Amino acid sequence: MRQDGEAAPRSPASGLARLGELVSQATVPGLKVRAETKGKARPLPFGVDAAGYRIVQEALTNARRHAGPATATVRVTYGEEDLTVQVDDDGLGPAARPAPAAGNGIAGMRERVSALGGELFAGPRPGGGFRVRARLPVNGVR
């Protein structure tokens, strides 16, 4: 129990150090998720780390909602000058997917990436499925 004046307990910040936990939570019946990391994981600027995590989280949420039975692969690449997060699913092709909900998933990803001076691709993959790929600069982050 807290005493007056004590701060409320805080949950750990969401960042890519918690990627394994995110992948475990996203794996549900009908969606198998796996993760790959390339490059040496290292501390990142807070905004980049949080944005990378949230983009993966939103892409996995979209895969669960729209892909149908599928496998999703999360790739996190630590480059010297940037961080790249990519989520591919092999679910239903874009023509077979239900119309997007009124949510702000991809728009929110675009805003996060733009605020950090990065690039985002979100669209169908050749041969079916969907890809979300964000490149976030780690040096000179605004």
Report the location of each language-model feature.
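Glycine-rich ATP/GTP-binding catalytic cores of kinases/NTPases
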Residues: M1-R142
